[in-house]
């Protein structure tokens, strides 16, 4: 696992069951970690303190690819994002692309 990082923006998580719903917010006082293993990626959100909450989501690579395609379609169909968010997302996407390039054999 990787170290926890501060959340600079925010995330909201909701899980709906037939008889109840769970909703949690993770803001600037929360932390996250994201990591990859052989089959999937995981995102873990942690809100420390008295009202501690933790949410973990594991997504297999095929589903992650489908999600990224749908996010790209959704972003392309809406008004352009502001400069800051556009830059942050482009830099992260470029880093992801570089990490997927074939690596020389050691």
Spans of model-derived segments:
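Positively charged, low-complexity terminal tracts
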Residues: 1-106
């Amino acid at each position: 696992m990787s170290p926890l990082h501060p959340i600079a923006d925010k995330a909201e998580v909701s899980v709906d069951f037939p008889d109840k719903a769970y909703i949690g917010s993770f803001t600037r006082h929360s932390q996250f970690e994201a990591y990859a293993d052989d089959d999937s990626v995981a995102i873990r959100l942690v809100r420390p303190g008295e009202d501690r909450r933790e949410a973990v989501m594991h997504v297999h690579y095929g589903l992650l690819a489908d999600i990224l395609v749908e996010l790209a379609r959704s972003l392309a169909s809406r008004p352009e994002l502001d400069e800051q968010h556009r830059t942050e997302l482009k830099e992260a996407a470029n880093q992801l692309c570089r990490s997927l390039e074939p690596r020389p054999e050691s």
